[in-house]
């Protein structure tokens, strides 16, 4: 039995086969999360891209828990230089871990580490979506992305049980595009994410799920979960 929980912004926790996996663990400074970094126990971290609101507390969590960080190659290299145990991957590649199978898909966005103090931007590779499969169940975390037509292909090739889609607009697709994305990927359940963390991405998630067709839409508050 797999338990999938949402923890605000784009933070998703998966519990399966006695393992805990965190996706995009932006905890410190996240006004929408219920988690505190110092309390989190995790076996693996999966990152969609290098922006601060997704990498978040990765370095501290990985070191404190001796957790592996699965990330696009350049981002994994960047984090490895900081003493983190990483497993680099790239778009289209998949790997079987002891906690489940991870495959990276396309995402249309950016990926960089921004050092505000020194006013520098470090390239951290291509952004990715994440397909996670364990116990014959598949979770799709779209990462930060625009709508793109190959979402149809993702839906054709994968039997997706639950999909987390960004709806905040401005930096990612907004609700209207996310409704079309949900139609294309054909997930059984769709959960909105990446909204209401900052004023510029304020959205009504309940209006979004009401517009969904041919799938179940579910708004998860921070800490709520779905059992697959």
From Swiss-Prot:
SUPFAM superfamilies: Metallo-hydrolase/oxidoreductase (SSF56281). It holds the Pfam family Lactamase_B_2. This is UPF0173 metal-dependent hydrolase BcerKBAB4_4442. Coiled coil: none annotated. HAMAP family: UPF0173 (MF_00457). Belongs to the UPF0173 family. It comes from the Bacteria. One of its GO terms (molecular function) is hydrolase activity. Keywords: Hydrolase. Gene3D superfamilies: Ribonuclease Z/Hydroxyacylglutathione hydrolase-like. It comes from Bacillus mycoides (strain KBAB4) (Bacillus weihenstephanensis).
């Amino acid at each position: 039995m797999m338990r999938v929980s949402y923890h605000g912004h784009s933070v998703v926790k998966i519990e399966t086969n006695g393992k805990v996996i965190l996706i995009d663990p932006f905890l410190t400074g996240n006004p929408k999360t219920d988690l505190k970094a110092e309390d989190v126990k995790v076996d693996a971290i999966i990152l969609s891209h290098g922006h601060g609101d997704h990498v978040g507390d990765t370095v501290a969590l990985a070191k404190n828990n001796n957790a592996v960080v699965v990330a696009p190659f350049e981002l994994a290299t960047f984090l490895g230089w900081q003493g983190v145990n990483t497993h680099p991957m790239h778009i289209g590649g998949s790997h079987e871990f002891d906690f489940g199978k991870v495959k990276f898909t396309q995402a249309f966005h950016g990926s960089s580490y921004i050092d505000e103090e020194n006013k520098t931007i470090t390239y951290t590779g291509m952004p990715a979506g994440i397909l996670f499969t364990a116990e014959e169940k598949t979770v799709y975390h779209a990462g930060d992305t625009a709508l793109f037509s190959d979402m149809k292909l993702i839906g054709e090739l994968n039997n997706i049980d639950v999909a987390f889609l960004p709806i905040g607009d401005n930096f990612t697709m907004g609700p209207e595009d996310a409704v079309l994305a949900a139609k294309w990927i054909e997930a059984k359940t769709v959960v909105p994410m990446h909204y209401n963390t900052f004023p510029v991405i304020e959205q009504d998630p309940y209006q979004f799920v009401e517009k969904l067709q041919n799938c179940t839409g579910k708004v998860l508050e921070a800490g709520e979960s779905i059992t697959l």
